[in-house]
Amino acid sequence: GHELQKLEKYIVGSKNKYDALLVKSYDNVWGHDIKLHAQNYNYENHLYSFYKANCDLNINTAVSNGKYEDYKIVYMPAYNIVTDAEKEKIKEYVKNGGTLVLTFRSGTRDEYNRVRPMALPGVFKEIAGIEAVEFDAPRKPVKIYGEVSGSAEIWCDIIKPDTAKTICTYGSEYYKGESAVTVNEYGKGRVYYVGCDLDNDAMKELVRIISKSANVETVDTPNGVEVVKRDDCTIILNHNENEVDTKIKGVSLFDGLEFNGVLDGYGVQFLEGSI
């Protein structure tokens, strides 16, 4: 009770600080359910891979279809059904300095789920600065090399960059050496195009690169340790039953003393300000 009284002014009325937005569209949920195109493809799992990578790096990530301009990074995995109004809204977000992350299976259908007669990635082709000339659903893992190394197992867009820069290339199959992940400067912002699924470690490293480019801070912690940033404080939670050295330092709001980074099993710590 006494601890809660000390924290009251930091908690009551405060809000989580979200740097990233993961856009989930139910139109696209239903659209992908109708047309899988690849046996192991699952739209929800595709979204989760981006969410998990952000969580692993302790980036507060909202999940909605909200105001893009409120976030430094907007992730739109497999955003295939797009209205003309959405297209313009997304374009303006990037022009004004936002960082947009697109993936394979994006931009090719209108609000009625009708295919647009356009080269891939459809309405996003200009801002992504690429053309996906072909795609493959590989029968075995395909290696990925470049700024991020890993593998793809479900989907591979074969990308021809126009104004975009290649970040990763494929290391096997008939498209060996072709672009797998790109980034394009557009207006004051940038657009990442992820042409394939990625294993967990590779996805985490890609999200780290994207976050750094957008001036979003990442925090590495041991497994089971969560960091939540609010307006005037940072909350650290140990979801493990054992004591953990989080390596995080700061002034504790419980007693005003320097926190040494060690949390008891299932322990929690409130630190002053944002770490």
Stretches found by the model and what they are:
Residues 1-275:
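Carbohydrate-binding surfaces of carbohydrate-active enzymes
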